[in-house]
């Protein structure tokens, strides 16, 4: 099988590759340094390799081409990147004073069709390869000239429909880029028969399941959840929560829950009370996300007072809660707004 990309290979794998080329193992270590520390983009740029090797047919490093970049007023960066097969994807860099979070995509498009999310409006093209996920982190690092501290799989796609490649990418981010696995979050809207298996696969392949799992609920009951998330019809609320309990038992890590707040639809104090009942016993954290508008839907962003009241109702019932600040709204880079659309940026 032809090598798809060098990016994503470990130092040991690159040393083996060097041996196969008749080179000493230290060439593999040098290549590892150029791929991950220096962020090499082109084969010919790796000047430590022998000239004769560099002049041969270039090997695929696995780096994307930047199509557009958009910088929001709050400093959030949105990049439109091109894949080798002519598709495109979006990734986002979210800076604060003491951290840089990269919001990565796991698929080109998304099949889940959540009504409040722009990505699902275009359907699924394909799942991303591990190197295409790692490349997003390297590209944001390169453009923003800052080392990413956190990675969240909250961009385009449903990570649990690409769990094999997602876990491979997480392994690379931890092993080769030195990221703490606890600073990596995998977000899912829920796919039947995948949550316990994700924990088992992480233990088998990574030796631990230390990344954070964030499960998107978005409603306090099955009926409303089905209205917002069509695929929820195949995944009863009770079964989703039971699978979350199994995940916790296997991984030893708590689950966090995400809840998008839609004005006058799922943001009442009564619904907050119902949500608190659903997550009772999880010792979990609920992350509230005020809706970020998209063109195709008429959902409303909730008034700040309703957001505060919803959060207060959860806290009164012993639920740890936070409200996510919307970042990159003026460039359609906020949660739920990614869609592979060219806007004429740099």
Swiss-Prot record:
Q: Which reaction does it catalyse?
A: adenosine(2503) in 23S rRNA + 2 reduced [2Fe-2S]-[ferredoxin] + 2 S-adenosyl-L-methionine = 2-methyladenosine(2503) in 23S rRNA + 5'-deoxyadenosine + L-methionine + 2 oxidized [2Fe-2S]-[ferredoxin] + S-adenosyl-L-homocysteine; adenosine(37) in tRNA + 2 reduced [2Fe-2S]-[ferredoxin] + 2 S-adenosyl-L-methionine = 2-methyladenosine(37) in tRNA + 5'-deoxyadenosine + L-methionine + 2 oxidized [2Fe-2S]-[ferredoxin] + S-adenosyl-L-homocysteine
**Which cofactors, if any, are listed as required?**
[4Fe-4S] cluster
Q: What keywords is this UniProt entry annotated with?
A: 4Fe-4S, Cytoplasm, Disulfide bond, Iron, Iron-sulfur, Metal-binding, Methyltransferase, rRNA processing, S-adenosyl-L-methionine, Transferase, tRNA processing
Domain (Radical SAM core) ranges: 96-330
CDD domains (alphabetical): Radical_SAM
Binding locations of [4Fe-4S] cluster: 110, 114, 117
Q: Which residue positions are annotated as catalytic?
A: 90 (proton acceptor), 335 (s-methylcysteine intermediate)
Report the GO terms under cellular component: cytoplasm
MF-aspect GO terms: 4 iron, 4 sulfur cluster binding; metal ion binding; rRNA (adenine(2503)-C2-)-methyltransferase activity; rRNA binding; tRNA (adenine(37)-C2)-methyltransferase activity; tRNA binding
GO terms for biological process, alphabetical: rRNA base methylation; tRNA methylation
Domain of life per record: Bacteria
Query: According to the record, how does the cofactor bind?
Result: Binds 1 [4Fe-4S] cluster. The cluster is coordinated with 3 cysteines and an exchangeable S-adenosyl-L-methionine.
Tell me the disulfide pairings in this chain.
Answer: 103-335
E.C. code: 2.1.1.192
InterPro entries cross-referenced by the UniProt entry: Aldolase_TIM (IPR013785), Methyltransferase_A (IPR040072), RlmN_N (IPR048641), RNA_MTrfase_RlmN (IPR027492), rRNA_lsu_MTrfase_RlmN/Cfr (IPR004383), rSAM (IPR007197)
State which residue ranges cross the membrane: none
Q: Binding of S-adenosyl-L-methionine: at which residues?
A: 157-158, 187, 216-218, 292
* HAMAP family found in the cross-reference section: RNA_methyltr_RlmN
Q: Which NCBIfam families match?
A: rRNA_mod_RlmN
Function, in words: Specifically methylates position 2 of adenine 2503 in 23S rRNA and position 2 of adenine 37 in tRNAs.
Supply any other comment: Reaction proceeds by a ping-pong mechanism involving intermediate methylation of a conserved cysteine residue.
Identify its protein family: Belongs to the radical SAM superfamily. RlmN family.
Q: This protein is called what? A: Probable dual-specificity RNA methyltransferase RlmN
């Amino acid at each position: 099988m032809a090598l798809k990309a060098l990016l994503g290979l470990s130092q040991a794998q690159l040393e083996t590759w060097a041996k196969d080329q008749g080179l000493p193992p230290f060439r593999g270590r040098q290549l590892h340094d150029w791929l991950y520390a220096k962020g090499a983009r082109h084969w010919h740029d790796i000047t430590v390799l022998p000239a004769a090797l560099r002049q041969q047919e270039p090997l695929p490093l696995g780096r994307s081409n930047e199509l557009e970049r958009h910088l929001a007023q709050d400093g959030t960066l949105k990049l439109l990147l091109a894949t080798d097969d002519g598709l495109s994807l979006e990734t986002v860099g979210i800076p604060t004073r003491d951290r840089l979070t990269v919001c990565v995509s796991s698929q080109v498009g998304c099949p889940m069709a959540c009504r409040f999310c722009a990505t699902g409006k275009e359907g699924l093209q394909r799942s991303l390869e591990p190197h295409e996920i790692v490349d997003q982190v390297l590209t944001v690092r390169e453009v923003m000239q800052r080392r990413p501290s956190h990675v969240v799989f909250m961009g385009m796609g449903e990570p649990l429909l690409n769990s094999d490649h997602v876990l491979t990418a997480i392994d690379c981010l931890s092993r080769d880029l030195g990221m703490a696995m606890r600073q990596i979050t995998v977000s899912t809207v829920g796919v039947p028969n995948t949550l316990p298996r994700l924990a088992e696969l992480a233990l088998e392949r990574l030796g631990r399941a230390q990344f954070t799992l964030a499960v998107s609920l978005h409603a306090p009951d099955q009926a409303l959840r089905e209205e917002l998330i069509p695929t929820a019809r195949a995944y009863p609320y009770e079964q989703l929560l039971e699978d979350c309990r199994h995940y916790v038992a296997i991984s030893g890590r708590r689950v966090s829950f995400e809840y998008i707040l839609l004005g006058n639809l799922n943001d009442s104090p009564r619904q907050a009370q119902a949500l608190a009942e659903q997550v009772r016993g999880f010792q979990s954290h609920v992350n509230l996300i005020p809706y970020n508008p998209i063109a195709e839907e008429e959902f409303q962003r909730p008034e700040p007072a309703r957001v505060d009241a919803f959060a207060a109702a959860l806290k009164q019932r012993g639920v740890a809660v936070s409200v996510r600040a919307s970042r990159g709204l003026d460039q359609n880079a906020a949660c739920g707004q990614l869609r592979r659309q060219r806007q004429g940026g740099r």
